[in-house]
Swiss-Prot record:
GO cellular component: cytoplasm
Gene Ontology annotations of biological process type: regulation of DNA repair
Transmembrane intervals: none
Protein name: Regulatory protein RecX
Subcellular location: Cytoplasm
HAMAP family found in the cross-reference section: RecX
Function: Modulates RecA activity.
Family, as annotated: Belongs to the RecX family.
Name of a matching Pfam family: RecX_HTH1
Source species, domain of life: Bacteria
Disulfide bridge map: none
Amino acid sequence: MKITKLEKKKRLYLMELDNGDKCYITEDTIVRFMLSRDKVISEEELKEIQDFAQFSYGKNLALYHLSFKARTEKEVREYLKKYDINENIVSQVIANLKEEKWINDSQYAYAIINANQLSGDKGPYVLTQKLAQKGISKSTIEEILNDFDFSEVAQRVANKLLKKYEGKLPARALQDKIIQNLTNKGFSYFDAKIAFDELDSQVDEETTQELIFKELDKQYTKYARKYEGYELKQRLTQVLARKGYDFSDIASALREYL
């Protein structure tokens, strides 16, 4: 077979043969096989050219995708599949990129976790979930997590939460709110409780009284329309307890209020 045309088409070249066959190849393919118009190639050589062209095209696509930011093996593999590249060729491209250090799931996971240590607010459980979604193996994630201490991150988040809710919630509700937020962000209950216990979060009696009477004003208006006497007192006690107030504070406030 003889090459009758080599024509540049954007990022690829169109190669036509005298038997009517056509295929798109990369510039790397032309250089590797020293292709030119009128060159004669065999069926075997054509197969090698086509395979390498797919590999070269896939690698170029992957490198373009990686040029914007680091990606995991799973992300690159899924990106290449959009271009209908043969699965075997995709695996070859991935293996080549890993060998050349363009893809390294361990480094990717380390970078994400380390960035979180410096300025993030996520605990190990959420990070594990996010990294697993990127295709990183559980064993790789666990190995890297073992190198980090999340107590400082938990403390940083707890301090921010304290600033947000202090003076707005009674002591028990404040504790519940901060611990719940920490566990939602991926910290264990144990670590969340330690972070809370290290806060300077004393809610003084005057603040508690102010908060409880403010809440009573709102709830009394709501329940006094339907209840009175003992039933009203019970309803108010229940709603205040759900809001996080201690029963002793509730009883004291109701004695003054009713």
